[in-house]
Structure formats: structure tokens, C-alpha cells
């Protein structure tokens, strides 16, 4: 019944926003960070703590180690969009989902066909030279034997948000606008423990707040509907109900 209720709310909504976290991509084989099987708990042979390896300080102080870690654990070229990504893209094409806000950096929403995507933490597919500002494809990062360099000699870094760095103000503004003007907000695959992204929920003033997560979160009681199940299974079922 919960899936049917969500499908009904999507059909009657004039602005549905999906706000997703790492759980959106785990079904594509990309590990998260904080779960029992996540990156922080499974990698013990690193030269520095995992959180430092993902920090601005590490990029500046130990760039070779940073990029070795980044290429090994943050970029997943074998990953493909899963059923949840595809369902959201289909719902967007049908005019039933207006915006996707993601904390993921893998670009799988766009690969599935979604167009209105706000990437709060950036993307592995956007890279730039710190010296001249030139944009570079992911291959420049992946194919470099060590620290990737631009033809000008500057270091090429990924446009992803590292620890000690702030989210882009334009992305935050766009996400705030999308959430504050939505009448249905679907939050999926996130424990809402990462700030400032999690704080965006306070801007929601719409009719229905829905959580889809395998595990309970501390925010469940604030939702109008909670579905403890996989995102791919849930969103596919909802898509079929909305688009028979």
C-alpha cells in the first residue's frame, strides 16, 4: 500500500523533487562510506585515515597518495545506472519528477537520462587545472601515472567537494529553491547525517515528505510516509503504477 500511496502523490503533485544519497548508487555496486560494509570500515591498509585521504589537506600535502586513493575508491567506471536511476529518469521524461538533488559524484543519474540534476558534491566527470582553469575529462585523471597534470604544468583536480571544502553556493541555492517550491519531496538512500546537505530539508514546506531507506533514520517520524526497502525495487514499482 505504501508504494501505491507514493504513486498517487506523484500523480497529483505539481512539483516532485527527489533528494538522494549513497544508497542510490550502492545498487550499482558503488560502496558507501559509513555503513558496516562501507569504505570507512573496510579499508585498513591506507597510508592515512580515510577521511583525511578525502580532504583538501591531503590533496595539497600528499597529492600522489590522494590521487591513488581517489582513482581506486572514488571512481567506478564499471558502474551502470540501476533500476532506481532508470525509474527516476522515466518519471522525469513523463513530467512527474521535476528535479533530482544528489549527494553522489558518479553521474549515474545523467547516464540514465535525467536532465534536471543538482550535484551537491560535484562530479568525477568534471575536472579542472588549478593553474589555468582548463576543463579536462575523467580520462586525464585516470590515465595519469601519478598526479595528473595539464599541458600548462598545473595539477588537474576533480570538481568534487572534499572535506574542509564548502559546497558551491550556486548548487546550494538551486537545491534550496527546488526543495522550497516542491509539494512532494522524496528522500532516498541517505541517513541524513552529512551536513550541510541534510539541513536542506528544513526548507521543505510542501504537502508530503517521503523517506525511502533500507534502515531507519532519526528523521523518519517527520515523514508522511516511510518505506524501508530498496530504492530500485520501490521506484520501479512506483514508476509502473504511475506509467502503466
Curated annotation (Swiss-Prot):
NCBIfam families: PRK00481.1-1. This is NAD-dependent protein deacetylase. Binds 1 zinc ion per subunit. GO terms for molecular function: histone deacetylase activity, NAD-dependent; NAD+ binding; zinc ion binding. The keyword Transferase applies. Its main location: cytoplasm. It is found in: Cytoplasm. Belongs to the sirtuin family. Class U subfamily. InterPro entries: DHS-like_NAD/FAD-binding_dom (IPR029035), NAD-dep_sirtuin_deacylases (IPR050134), Sirtuin (IPR003000), Sirtuin_cat_small_dom_sf (IPR026591), Sirtuin_class_U (IPR028628), Ssirtuin_cat_dom (IPR026590). Gene3D superfamilies: SIR2/SIRT2 'Small Domain (3.30.1600.10), TPP-binding domain (3.40.50.1220). NAD-dependent protein deacetylase which modulates the activities of several enzymes which are inactive in their acetylated form. It comes from the Bacteria. The active site is at residue 121. NAD(+) binds at residues 22, 26, 33-34, 103, 105-106, 121, 190-191, 213, 231. Nicotinamide binds at residues 33, 105-106. PROSITE patterns: SIRTUIN. Zn(2+) binds at residues 129, 132, 150, 152. It holds the Pfam family SIR2.
Amino acid at each position: 500500500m505504501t508504494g501505491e500511496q507514493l504513486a498517487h502523490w506523484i500523480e497529483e503533485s505539481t512539483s516532485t523533487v527527489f533528494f538522494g544519497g549513497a544508497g542510490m548508487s550502492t545498487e550499482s555496486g558503488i560502496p558507501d562510506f559509513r555503513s558496516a560494509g562501507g569504505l570507512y570500515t573496510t579499508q585498513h591498509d591506507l597510508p592515512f585515515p580515510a577521511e583525511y585521504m578525502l580532504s583538501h589537506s591531503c590533496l595539497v600535502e600528499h597529492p600522489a597518495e590522494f590521487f591513488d586513493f581517489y582513482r581506486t575508491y572514488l571512481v567506478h567506471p564499471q558502474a551502470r545506472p540501476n533500476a532506481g536511476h532508470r525509474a527516476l529518469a522515466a518519471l522525469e521524461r513523463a513530467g512527474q519528477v521535476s528535479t533530482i538533488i544528489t549527494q553522489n559524484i558518479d553521474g549515474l543519474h545523467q547516464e540514465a537520462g535525467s536532465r534536471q540534476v543538482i550535484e551537491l558534491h560535484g562530479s568525477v566527470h568534471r575536472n579542472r587545472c588549478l593553474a589555468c582553469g582548463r576543463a579536462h575529462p575523467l580520462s586525464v585523471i585516470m590515465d595519469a601515472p601519478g598526479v595528473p597534470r595539464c599541458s600548462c604544468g598545473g595539477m588537474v583536480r576533480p570538481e568534487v567537494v572534499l572535506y574542509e571544502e564548502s559546497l558551491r553556493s550556486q548548487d546550494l541555492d538551486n537545491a534550496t529553491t527546488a526543495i522550497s517550491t516542491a509539494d512532494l519531496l522524496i528522500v532516498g538512500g541517505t541517513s541524513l547525517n552529512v551536513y550541510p546537505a541534510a539541513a536542506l530539508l528544513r526548507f521543505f514546506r510542501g504537502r508530503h515528505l517521503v523517506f525511502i531507506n533500507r534502515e531507519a533514520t532519526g528523521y523518519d517520524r517527520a515523514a508522511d510516509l516511510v518505506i524501508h526497502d530498496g530504492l530500485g525495487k520501490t521506484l520501479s514499482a512506483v514508476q509502473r503504477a504511475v506509467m502503466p
